[in-house]
Amino acid sequence: MALDADLEAWLRLSLIDGVGTQTLHKLLLEFGTPAGVLAASPRALAVVVPPRLASSITAGGASDEALSAVAAWLDDPANHIITLADSEYPQSLLQTADPPPLLYAKGRIGLLNQPAFAIVGSRNATAQGSANAEAFATTLGDAGMVIVSGLALGIDAAAHRGGLASRASTIAVVGTGLDSVYPARNRPLAHDIAASGLIISEFALGTPPLAGNFPRRNRLICGLARGVLVVEAAISSGSLITARLAAEQGREVFAIPGSIHSPLAKGCHALIKQGAKLVESAQDILEELGATMPQTPDKTAAAADGDDVLLAHIGFEPVDVQAICTRSGLAAAEVNAALTSLEITGQIESLPGGRWQRVH
């Protein structure tokens, strides 16, 4: 797809080697917009950044080849880039100290501004720990909270599975570019999340899983969420970093206790000693956050409302299910159910290749 001028300016600036989040914020504070930064004189830029970086900016920023790669990635209707200037940018991140200027996203971007809750923990989780994470995630998701985690093995993966099984779905925040999945063992899970949830990253396409990326990923996990639950964690677990960042951002921190003999309970016990709230059920979290389980809706009325919402996102040109999910923010299961209903009532028709179009 062709990049519009504003997005091209964001990309040309953000893809320059040496322009990280803090530097870009400084430049935007001084010059207003990415286009303003790129149009600035070397002398003006040198007041804010080192001369070598100023030269890279005045040379026009990132290469045309780099931008072409991003444009090709955006040809997939499930893929998005959201900037600080966009209305879709998550309001919860705007309240943090250093919100990423750009977010690369794959899936339902409407989830970014829904109430969210994070669940994290050990990569080497026990079977009970994984079961707890999945069960808590499903219950919290059914209460309307999008489940946020980091797509790691163990507790993260279980939390995502629970979120996918709930009515609210899940967001995976990753420490690589969105053109790869890390760890590779979670590729099927990532596929499911992209289809009915959302995967986001602040890192450019092609970014490998460098160790320094994951603390930055962790700050986004807790920045998106109203609170963070640590399910299992050793005393040296990265989940404790996430919990610390959450506390610094004013988020609630919760922990599930375990056996005094279990290494995977020591991190949770340390958090509880430091003031994290001990929880034994998802209801404990809901009560602390002032949330409640939703009332069972009238299914007939809800289905009719869902049909109307979906119809607004189907035009007279053929469109596939993934594109409809992206436009509407609905999960694939909801979309497929509504498509069947709309076809029965004669408002849309199915076409070869799994595509649909409006009839009248």
Predicted regions and their residues:
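Glycine-biased, small-residue-rich flexible motifs in mid-sequence functional cores and linkers
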Residues: 1-5, 84-360
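Short, small/acidic-rich helices and loops at N termini and domain boundaries
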Residues: 1-88, 345-347, 352-360
